[in-house]
Amino acid sequence: MSLQAITVTLNPAIDQTIQLDRLQPGAVHRASSVRNDAGGKGINVAACLADWGSQVAALGVLGVGNAGVFEALFRERGITDHCHRVAGDTRTNLKLVEAQVNETTDINLPGLQLGQAHLQGVADHLAPLLRAGLPVVLSGSLPAGLPEDSWAQLQAQASAAGARVLLDTSGAPLVAALAAAPVAMPYAVKPNRHELEAWTGHPLGDHAALTAAAHALIARGIQLVVISMGTEGALFVQRDQQLIARPPRLAQGSSVGAGDAMVAGLAAALLDDATELEQCARLATAFSMCRLESGDARRITPEGVRDAAAAVVIGAVP
């Protein structure tokens, strides 16, 4: 089977999860367990797509010092590795989990220092894989040293080849990507309310304001805007229709990776030729629901997604 989707992660991380009874500042602790997982938003998207049965390639930048953690995930899930290797170690994010209170403290360590030459290395890996219609997910933050328009550069490259770019980032990189010419705009974006407010420069306090902001993006050339609204679900907007998709019940536990799973669901909808907005919303929301129920930011099951899709609550925008 030929390649069906690409994800690009410029700032991946190894998630090191340390289990403790209780975290006490200034004290010496004995951990009950520790595990290392390959992480980063695009990596999570690739893993979910692979679980769905898609042939997916992961691109990005990995430090050779600890690339083995990522290589193990790629082998396990059947993900094609097209990551650009550089000297040094990929960053590690510490997650201190307190069993007694079920709380997690995150400590994100500095990442690799990269430059334009490294971004060009990723672009060189990407170029021969691109083709018309191919879903290309550009996801996550930028490491130190890369210019704010790094996603915009890769977005323009993929769009010029006719690929369908799904962009999930925030802050200045999002602003730069959304300033592109109409022909270089992403196919879809998935901001949350706060990220969209940062782009518009003013509060978006209700569904009408969110929908108006989404249509402003569509007027610039984007085909689909998906706005995460937390416990309210997600707002899906196209030029001629909009709807809200909600899970039937609130999930328990960590929401880490739920947004990445939703992006994977959007890519899966493109691959399944889900032409109706409701089909797309059901599948994307079901991916997110299944991720929450699995307890693993990188894991879904096709059976779980199909069951969840039927249970997604679809409503009109008030």
UniProtKB/Swiss-Prot annotation:
The alphabetical list of record keywords is: ATP-binding, Kinase, Nucleotide-binding, Transferase
From which organism does this entry originate? Xanthomonas campestris pv. campestris (strain ATCC 33913 / DSM 3586 / NCPPB 528 / LMG 568 / P 25)
Note the CDD domains from the entry. Answer: FruK_PfkB_like
The Swiss-Prot or TrEMBL record annotates one GO molecular function as: ATP binding
Chain's gene name: fruK
Q: In its keyword annotation, does this UniProt entry include Transmembrane?
A: no
The EC designation for this entry is: 2.7.1.56
Q: Which residues bind ATP?
A: 228-233, 259-260
Instruction: State the protein's purpose.
Output: Catalyzes the ATP-dependent phosphorylation of fructose-l-phosphate to fructose-l,6-bisphosphate.
Q: Which family does it belong to?
A: Belongs to the carbohydrate kinase PfkB family.
**What is the reaction catalyzed?**
beta-D-fructose 1-phosphate + ATP = beta-D-fructose 1,6-bisphosphate + ADP + H(+)
Name the InterPro entries for this protein.
1-PFruKinase, Carboh/pur_kinase_PfkB_CS, PfkB_dom, Ribokinase-like, Tagatose/fructose_Pkinase
Kindly list the GO CC terms recorded for this protein: cytosol
Q: Which PANTHER family match?
A: 1-PHOSPHOFRUCTOKINASE, 1-PHOSPHOFRUCTOKINASE-RELATED
Q: Which PROSITE patterns match?
A: PFKB_KINASES_1, PFKB_KINASES_2
Active site positions, chain numbering: 260 (proton acceptor)
Q: What is this protein called?
A: 1-phosphofructokinase
Pfam families the record matches: PfkB (PF00294)
| Induction of expression | Induced by fructose.
